[in-house]
Regions:
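N-terminal structural segment of carbohydrate-active enzymes
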Residues: 1-179, 185
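Extended, hydrophobic alpha-helical segments in both membrane/secreted and soluble proteins
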Residues: 184-196
Length: 196
């Protein structure tokens, strides 16, 4: 996009993405045209699993969760799926078994923390930093807090309240080989089907 920039007094060229993108490249640097009706991004678990119907909203029992935190440390999920949409397709995992138990106990609605494209999470796992917590540092110690703060701008922990593209699923929650274009949409839909 070529625009006049008063601060520089010149016409500048900027690379931008479509704010209404439904598909993006890794780290959201480019928009990708995605046909949302394409059967290749409609997994059977999403197409064939109906959403439960709750006629009276007063009957909802809601469980809120964060996509990454749900499975990031769950060793019953294959490592490459931890912290991703695809963890919700692992029905024998600790997390999914726990959700099934909650469902049997009356929980009937899952509320996800933001899953749209988030501005400040590095989508490539290799670019995500992990805090180096000093041995013996307590959870509320200054050392632990300093280690977390040192990588806060480059880690994968973020509640998601800094949207970049409202209509596209967050790429860091997709498995490494499925972060581009419609592939992350497919994995998001797999999660939805898995939760139903």
């Amino acid at each position: 996009v070529r625009v006049y920039v008063p601060a520089t007094g010149a016409v500048e060229t900027n690379q931008v993405t479509d704010p209404y993108s439904v598909g993006l490249t890794v780290n959201s640097t480019r928009s990708v045209a995605v046909n949302m009706d394409n059967p290749s991004i409609a997994p059977s678990v999403w197409k064939n699993t109906k959403a439960p119907v709750i006629d009276d909203d007063a009957e909802r029992s809601i469980y809120e969760l964060h996509v990454r935190d749900f499975s990031a440390a769950d060793k019953s999920v294959p490592e490459y799926m931890r912290g991703t949409y695809m963890a919700f397709t692992q029905y024998q995992s600790n997390g999914m078994r726990h959700l099934a138990e909650l469902s049997r106990a009356g929980m009937n609605t899952v509320h996800l923390l933001p899953t749209f494209d988030i501005a400040t999470i590095p989508e490539k796992r290799a670019d995500q930093k992990t805090p180096a917590i000093p041995e013996g540092a307590g959870p509320a110690s200054e050392e632990q807090q300093a280690a977390v703060a040192a990588v806060a701008d480059e880690d994968a922990y973020n509640w998601g309240y800094d949207p970049l593209h409202w209509m596209a699923p967050e790429g860091s929650y997709a498995t490494a080989s499925h972060q581009n274009g419609g592939a992350r949409v497919r994995e998001f839909r797999s999660m939805v089907g898995g939760l139903h």
